[in-house]
């Protein structure tokens, strides 16, 4: 199992279905004032010719804010994906998915810019990012 790059975290990440390619728009699940995040790259992806880099729950991406506060727009910000609609299989055999795609804005170390998260987050994300897990109200 290859680990995929994450800044400032420890722990193993198992293979998951990659549900969010570059150019996907996801909801912003924190209280920073951003509404939508547009994925422009995925951290730690080596890639192959003509293949779009894709992200899944727990991955750090570089994103821009498409809707939200003017001071957040037109900047490249790191974000962590906390929910995805594409089903993935967990080690216990359960197929898991959420009803929307969502991410939270973080700093390069993985500390949240906001102070609260709306909605549940995936267990895979909570295991890798303890600062995000502490702000979540539900971990599924």
Curated annotation (Swiss-Prot):
Any GO CC annotation of this UniProt entry: extracellular region
Record flagged with keyword Transmembrane: no
Gene Ontology process terms (BP): translation
SMART domains: Ribosomal_L14 (SM01374)
SUPFAM superfamilies: Ribosomal protein L14 (SSF50193)
Pfam families on file: Ribosomal_L14
UniProt entry keywords in alphabetical sequence: Ribonucleoprotein, Ribosomal protein
MF terms in GO: mRNA binding; structural constituent of ribosome
Family: Belongs to the universal ribosomal protein uL14 family.
Name of protein: Large ribosomal subunit protein uL14x/uL14z/uL14y
Organism annotation: Arabidopsis thaliana (Mouse-ear cress)
Organism ancestry: Eukaryota, Viridiplantae, Streptophyta, Embryophyta, Tracheophyta
Gene behind this protein: RPL23A
């Amino acid at each position: 199992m290859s680990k995929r790059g994450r800044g400032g975290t420890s722990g193993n990440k198992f293979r998951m279905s990659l549900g969010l390619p570059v150019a996907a728009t996801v909801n912003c699940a924190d209280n920073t004032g951003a509404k939508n995040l547009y994925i422009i790259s995925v951290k730690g992806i080596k890639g192959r010719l003509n293949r779009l880099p894709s992200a899944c729950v727990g991955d750090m991406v570089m994103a821009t804010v498409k809707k939200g506060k003017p001071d957040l727009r037109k900047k490249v910000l790191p974000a962590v994906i906390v929910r995805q609609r594409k089903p993935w299989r967990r080690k216990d055999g359960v197929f898991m998915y959420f009803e929307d795609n969502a991410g939270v804005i973080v700093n390069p170390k993985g500390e949240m810019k906001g102070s609260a998260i709306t909605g549940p987050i995936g267990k895979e994300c909570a295991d890798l990012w303890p600062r995000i897990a502490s702000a979540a109200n539900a971990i599924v």
